[in-house]
Amino acid sequence: MERLEPDYLAARLERGHVFDAACRSREVLVHLTGKWSVLILIALRGGTMRFAELRRKVNGVSERMLAKSLQQLESHGLLVRRSFPVVPPHVEYTLTPLGHEAAARIEKLTDWIEENVHALDPGQADPKPL
């Protein structure tokens, strides 16, 4: 059986056209890579969390932005919201398998950023060309 090269396979797979303004992938990309969404996904890699726990973990996020980001991530199937019928309200958020995969990939990018933050400093004089 003929072995196909990865570049060939990538070209053959329909992945969307992220550069097209009407592409659904772009909408997901915008929601997934938002400042708060990235931090929420990484925080939830540690396990299920309640709203207040997430708010404390993701320092600086407002209640409104946390709720909005959680709704967007849930709408894309990256996390599950579980509500318990108790007073006071008890709501938990857990990553789905797809959410775990996305979070793992995003965490690699954030690790790279933290390792290279000094080189990425806008105040640095001359960045080295490739």
Give the location of each predicted region.
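Long, low-complexity, charged/polar intrinsically disordered regions in eukaryotic proteins
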Residues: 1-14
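N-terminal helix-turn-helix DNA-binding core of bacterial DNA-binding proteins
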Residues: 15-65, 92
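Generic detection of well-ordered alpha-helical segments
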Residues: 30, 34, 38, 71, ...
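Alpha-helical linker/hinge and terminal dimerization helices associated
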Residues: 38, 42, 76, 105-120
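Basic amphipathic alpha-helical segments that dock to polyanions
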Residues: 66, 70-73
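Basic, amphipathic "hinge/linker" alpha-helix immediately C-terminal to the N-terminal HTH DNA-binding motif
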Residues: 85-108
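Exposed, interaction-prone assembly regions rather than primary DNA-binding/catalytic cores
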Residues: 122-130
